[in-house]
Amino acid sequence: MLDTPWSDGVPGISQGQIRPGCIFTFTWKATQHGSFFYHAHSSSQINDGLYGPIVIHPASSTPAPYGLITQDAKSLAAIQAAEKTRMPLLISDWRHIESGYEWESSRNSGVENPCFDSILVNGKGRVNCLSKEQQAALITPTRQMLLGLVPGSSLTDKSCLPPSVITILAAPGAPPPNFTAIPPNFFNGCRETAGSTEVIKITQESASDETWVMFDLIGSLSLQTIQFSLDELTMYVIAADGNYIEPETVQSVVITTGQRYTVLVQLTEPKTYAMRISGINDPQILFGNALLDFQIVGETQSTQPTMPYINEVGQNTTASVKFLNPDAIRPYLPDTIPSAADVTHKMTSLVDGQVIYWAFNETILPLDTEDFSPLLFGPQPGRRDNHTITNPSGNVWVDYIMQVPNLQPPHPMHIHGRHFYVLGKGEGPFPWANVAEAQAANSSAFNLVNPQLRDTFPTPAGGPKGSWLVLRRRSDNPGVWLMHCHTQSHIQGGMSMIIQDSIATLPEVPTEYSSWKC
């Protein structure tokens, strides 16, 4: 969102609320290419389906990594054709519960709700209800261990860990739960449906042609981290969060909420291939699917079912299945970054008084912030507090050190305004004052040569000793931006911070934005 911070879409930060019945038009400069998605930043409206894909095609002069996949001219031409017809796959976790009701009920019970009804692909999917026998066949050692914490407990009919187990997993400091305030349909009441299935149809006109397809896998997820695979087909991962990477050849891609990956697939045999999406969060067995229908004119399509690479809980079906390792991603044509940052910010995540209130810097962002007049319309150069970072103006490099001090789930960190470089991560505390000190103590934990460029990346899960993640980002894009965990219940619970970047050179907000009322 370069040079148009007023179109960043965060109420109370960069714009006013868009009330029901109102119309608001965003105008912005598309200076980047790749896969993105628009979504609500008000309350939990993203849980109610307020999201959609944005795919920006690269200029013809943009260097692409296709030559690292093949040097064959015919194949390269087919890949270029696939790029022009690339298709978004919007992957979502879905509840049959209105988000406001779900949030208030979780506040009243003190129990975070990790259960969903289905996985959707481009808005299509179905509810799958497993029998006790099917659950037993799929239960992972970790889920079995967690159930053992409460003797006699078992998965609910939604294949969720029961509330009695979920509360044990709550971070330290949470008050006792009120189980009687949990609506019965949150964890139970699975009703199988015969919903629609997304079918992608690809037709090759001649047997002598060559067909590649490009998919933008978009994690428009509320909570789930998922594994995505295409039966019998190998994927070339060519971009992460809109940025080209050195191609990774895999059979399954892990996607957290907010992340996007672009993949290339070559099709040679006419079949209907299953796309499999499996949630890998411990609290629930959740899965969905879509179909890729490939036909060649004049040839008979195979009717044999395709063989899966992963099962319903995201485990590999054979030892040869290769999973994407997000830590191993390297940029295509890496940028040069400075050896040290100009500014360092250290932040600690924790639960603030109740399990649904998550703090980013030991302080939650006030939950009514979205109702305020946008800070962008009146930035405060001297504002520095536990939920506001004000960086110096100019071409300043800033390190953000995310500290997770105890048992917590991964937090997919997302920063508006500029992508960031993932420098390193680790287990235990981060006792050093900055990255230079940490490098001197443990140089192998950091990459300043060719770090990946992302806009969403998870902290490591916090164990008994905690964990940390280090991100480096330029603050040269004038604006008031949001930094937040992309887990929806966490951002709604206050796990966000405000970043003021280069506000001394902030352009004047257009009148159609500053004077807009509804």
What are these regions (language model features)?
Residues 7-9, 41-42, 52, 102-103, ...:
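Short coil/turn segments at secondary-structure boundaries
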